[in-house]
């Protein structure tokens, strides 16, 4: 069964609401933990992941140099993609494209291929007017 536009929109809006209310939810959970003294923080760390903000500037020069070396080690893998068909060099569609759209494009591509083959057969047989 296909997903309706309404359900997609609702899901998107719920995700936005979660982002907006995340700080309030975190503070509420922390206050609950403060009330119950026998709960260990190790147990909480297994359940929820705590994100620590990263410093904007490197504090030591050694850390900056190490980061630069890691950036150089990255492999550049540019995926060559046909702009018209959206297929890459291996014949795969992009991840973000849904299955119905892939199926539709594949059928369209095969339809064009079939027409050109039929035309070639007619020309070969001498039936072209």
Curated annotation (Swiss-Prot):
* Primary localisation category: nucleus
Protein known as = Protein LLP homolog
Gene from which the chain derives: LLPH
Alphabetic keyword roster: Chromosome, Isopeptide bond, Nucleus, Ubl conjugation
Q: Name one Pfam family in it.
A: LLPH
Segments crossing the lipid bilayer: none
> What's a GO cellular component annotated to this UniProt protein?
nucleolus
Which residues are the signal sequence here? none
Q: What does this protein do?
A: In hippocampal neurons, regulates dendritic and spine growth and synaptic transmission.
What's the family? Belongs to the learning-associated protein family.
């Amino acid at each position: 069964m296909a997903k309706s536009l309404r359900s997609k929109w609702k899901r998107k809006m719920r995700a936005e609401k979660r982002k907006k209310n995340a700080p309030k939810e975190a503070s509420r959970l922390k206050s609950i933990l403060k009330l119950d003294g026998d709960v260990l923080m190790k147990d909480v760390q297994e359940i929820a992941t705590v994100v620590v903000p990263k410093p904007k500037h490197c504090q030591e020069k050694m850390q900056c140099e190490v980061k630069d070396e890691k950036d150089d080690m990255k492999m550049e893998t540019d995926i060559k993609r046909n702009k018209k068909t959206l297929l890459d060099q291996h014949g795969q569609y992009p991840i973000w494209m849904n299955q119905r759209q892939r199926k539709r494009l594949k059928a369209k591509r095969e339809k064009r291929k079939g027409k050109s083959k039929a035309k070639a057969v007619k020309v070969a047989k001498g039936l072209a007017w």
